[in-house]
C-alpha cells in the first residue's frame, strides 16, 4: 500500500518528501526505493531461479540490468515519529532495505511540524485508535494536524487512514 500511495502522487526524487508520522518507516522506505529506481526484491532469491527452463545466466543478467537502472542521484527523504523506539525500528528497516543513506529519521512531534520550504510533499499514515478512549485522542490529533497542514497551503498532503470523515477531522473543505 505504501509504494502504491507514493506512486499515486506526482512526487519524484527531486522534490521534498516528509512523512511526519513514519512509524516503522514503510512509506519513506518505499519512496526511497521508488526514487532510486530499486526494483522490489532485487536482493532476494526466488524459487523461480531454480526453474530448469530458465538458465542461471539469464537470472544473473536480469538482476544485473535491474541494478544498472538504479538511480545513483543523491536525494533525501525525511521521516519523523514521536516515539524514539519507532525511529530506531524505522532506521533498522531502512538499513535492511538498503536505503538508509537516503532517509533522515528523527524523533519529532508531527503537531509541531513547520517548514520554510515553499513546496513539498507530505505522505503519511497517521495512527488511528481502535479502543475506547483512544478515539477522542486520535480525533484531537487529526484536528491538530489539520491546523499544521493549513500553515503550509502550497504543500501537497496525502493521508491514508481507515477513519471515516477524515476531511472533517482535518477541517478541510
Predicted feature residues:
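Conserved S-adenosyl-L-methionine
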Residues: 2-114, 131, 137
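Conserved Class I SAM-dependent methyltransferase catalytic core
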Residues: 74-76, 80, 84-88, 132-173
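Non-catalytic accessory regions of SAM-dependent methyltransferases
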Residues: 95-111, 117, 150, 157-158, ...
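Short SAM/SAH-binding signature in class I
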Residues: 119-125
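Specific lipid-exposed transmembrane alpha-helices and their immediate membrane-water interface residues
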Residues: 127-129
Amino acid at each position: 500500500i505504501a509504494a502504491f500511495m507514493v506512486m499515486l502522487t506526482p512526487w519524484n526524487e527531486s522534490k521534498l518528501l516528509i512523512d511526519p508520522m513514519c512509524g516503522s518507516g514503510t512509506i519513506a522506505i518505499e519512496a526511497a526505493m521508488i526514487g532510486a529506481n530499486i526494483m522490489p526484491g532485487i536482493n532476494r532469491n526466488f524459487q523461480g531461479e531454480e526453474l530448469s527452463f530458465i538458465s542461471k545466466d539469464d537470472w544473473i543478467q536480469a538482476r544485473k540490468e535491474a541494478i544498472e537502472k538504479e538511480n545513483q542521484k543523491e536525494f533525501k527523504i525525511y521521516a519523523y515519529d514521536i516515539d524514539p523506539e519507532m525511529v530506531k525500528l524505522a532506521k533498522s528497516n531502512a538499513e535492511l532495505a538498503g536505503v538508509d543513506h537516503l532517509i533522515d529519521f528523527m524523533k519529532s512531534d508531527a503537531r509541531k511540524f513547520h517548514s520554510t520550504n515553499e513546496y513539498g510533499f507530505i505522505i503519511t499514515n497517521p495512527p488511528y485508535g481502535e479502543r475506547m478512549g483512544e478515539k477522542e485522542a486520535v480525533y484531537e490529533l487529526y484536528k491538530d494536524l489539520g491546523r499544521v497542514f493549513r500553515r503550509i497551503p502550497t504543500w501537497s498532503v496525502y493521508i491514508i487512514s481507515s477513519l471515516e470523515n477524515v476531511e472533517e477531522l482535518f477541517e478541510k473543505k
